[in-house]
């Protein structure tokens, strides 16, 4: 086999591969003879079909099957011999004739080689959240609201009421798509609608009609509406008042608390502290990773981005309960491209730093992280044993330990400032980020 490496711009190169004719033809001949022993053909007994007739009728098909198997073997050997780190490959068949060498080109996209420097340029705003009894009591109040029952009342709408409304949204006097609904249930103050919408309903009475003006957020998912002003014609059809349950043993049992009311507040606080810790870690990590992407300079392999896009499509279809008959190719790549590129770049950067700094996860560190994570479960020890039997879960935990070490290492060199934040705002932002798929 003859291999010529042709370097191209950036992370691209080509392998011009030539396989001797006698090697290819020998394999094809063997396959033809093997086929002749098993194929059925009119006028011949099984196993007695002449190889020449098999070649005449099926020779091209057999040759293409041989070539399809041979090409990956040959370019894999060439890649190994040349010690190339390949991210993606496309093959062009150049010559494929009996009695002549097989010639093809393997166009390669390589993993980029780069070094990350300039960590001192990264800016991170570290959120600081004070968790007091006030926040704990507010959380318990929120839990009561989750289990609230509602009864109809004859008065004006107040905060925390559940209303049934019809509404029609308009831009410049024209009804816009997706901006209207009938018999929509809405809890006032839930934040379900865009800012200003729910406040605009407060004070309305049953059967009253009102037109309100609101502005869509700049980051609204529909870019045609983002930052734009709109009006909504609203009709209130029903007003219901919330009745909150008492905080008693029956109430706390619904949230898996076994110690009754006496331990409820302590458990709620522990859960809040645990959730807050992981959310704040995630917020800091996201800033660190964003900063790393900004300082790192390299070309991102398109093959890796495409692979990530395909995986995101499959995950979305699975989450939405899509069946096997759904063609994921119907989903346009551009919906997933930005996130896919971000994920690939982050992964390449982290791998580069981990290799250069030789970060590792010690067994004791993995065990400590596992102990912390399982506290969120009803049966921590049982959950811990189940996870320890799952190699994939343990591998993920090791990755998380290393990721945490890397983050701390970058933070030690970055420009870090602190910012006071509200617990419930942090939780809300985290939920919005998860819903947006980030």
From Swiss-Prot:
GO terms for biological process: 'de novo' cotranslational protein folding; cell division; chaperone-mediated protein folding; protein transport; protein unfolding. It is found in: Cytoplasm. The keyword Cytoplasm applies. It catalyses: [protein]-peptidylproline (omega=180) = [protein]-peptidylproline (omega=0). GO terms for molecular function: peptidyl-prolyl cis-trans isomerase activity; protein folding chaperone; ribosome binding. Consists of 3 domains; the N-terminus binds the ribosome, the middle domain has PPIase activity, while the C-terminus has intrinsic chaperone activity on its own. Involved in protein export. Acts as a chaperone by maintaining the newly synthesized protein in an open conformation. Functions as a peptidyl-prolyl cis-trans isomerase. NCBIfam families: tig. This is Trigger factor. It comes from Francisella philomiragia subsp. philomiragia (strain ATCC 25017 / CCUG 19701 / FSC 153 / O#319-036). The gene is tig.
């Amino acid at each position: 086999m003859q291999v010529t490496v042709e370097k191209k711009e950036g992370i691209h190169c080509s392998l011009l591969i030539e396989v001797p004719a006698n090697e290819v033809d020998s394999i094809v001949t063997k396959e033809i003879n093997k086929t002749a022993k098993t194929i059925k053909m009119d006028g011949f007994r099984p196993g007695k079909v002449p190889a020449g007739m098999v070649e005449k009728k099926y020779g091209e098909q057999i040759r293409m099957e041989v070539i399809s198997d041979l090409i990956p073997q040959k370019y894999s050997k060439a890649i190994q011999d040349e010690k190339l780190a390949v991210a993606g490959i496309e093959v062009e068949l150049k010559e494929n004739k009996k009695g002549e060498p097989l010639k093809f080109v393997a166009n390669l996209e390589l993993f980029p080689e780069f070094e990350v420097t300039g960590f001192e340029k990264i800016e991170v705003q570290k959120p600081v959240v004070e968790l007091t009894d006030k926040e704990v009591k507010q959380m318990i109040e929120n839990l009561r609201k989750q289990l609230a029952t509602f009864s109809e009342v004859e008065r004006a709408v107040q905060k925390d009421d559940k209303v049934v409304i019809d509404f029609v949204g308009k831009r410049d006097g024209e009804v816009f798509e997706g901006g209207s609904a009938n018999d929509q249930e809405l809890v006032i103050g839930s934040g379900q609608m865009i800012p200003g919408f729910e406040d605009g309903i407060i004070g309305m009475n049953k059967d009253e009609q009102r037109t309100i003006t609101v502005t869509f957020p700049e980051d609204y998912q529909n870019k045609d509406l983002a930052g734009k002003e709109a009006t909504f014609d609203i009709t209130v059809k029903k007003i219901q008042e919330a009745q909150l349950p008492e905080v008693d043993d029956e109430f706390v049992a619904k949230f898996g608390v076994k110690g009754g009311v006496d331990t409820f507040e302590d458990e709620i606080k522990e859960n809040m502290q645990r959730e807050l810790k992981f959310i704040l870690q995630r917020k800091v990590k996201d800033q660190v990773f964003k900063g790393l992407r900004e300082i790192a300079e390299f070309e991102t392999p398109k093959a890796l981005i495409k692979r990530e896009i395909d995986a995101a499509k499959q995950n979305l279809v699975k989450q939405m309960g899509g069946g096997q008959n759904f063609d994921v190719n119907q989903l346009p790549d551009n919906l997933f491209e930005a996130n896919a590129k971000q994920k690939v770049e982050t992964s390449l950067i982290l791998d580069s730093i981990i290799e250069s700094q030789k970060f590792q996860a010690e067994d004791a560190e993995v065990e400590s992280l596992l102990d912390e994570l399982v506290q969120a479960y009803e049966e921590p020890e049982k959950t811990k044993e189940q996870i320890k039997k799952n190699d994939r879960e343990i591998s993920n935990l090791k990755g998380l330990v290393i990721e945490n070490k890397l983050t701390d290492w970058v933070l030690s060199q970055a420009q870090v400032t602190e910012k006071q934040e509200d617990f419930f705002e942090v939780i809300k932002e985290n939920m919005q980020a998860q819903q947006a798929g980030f």
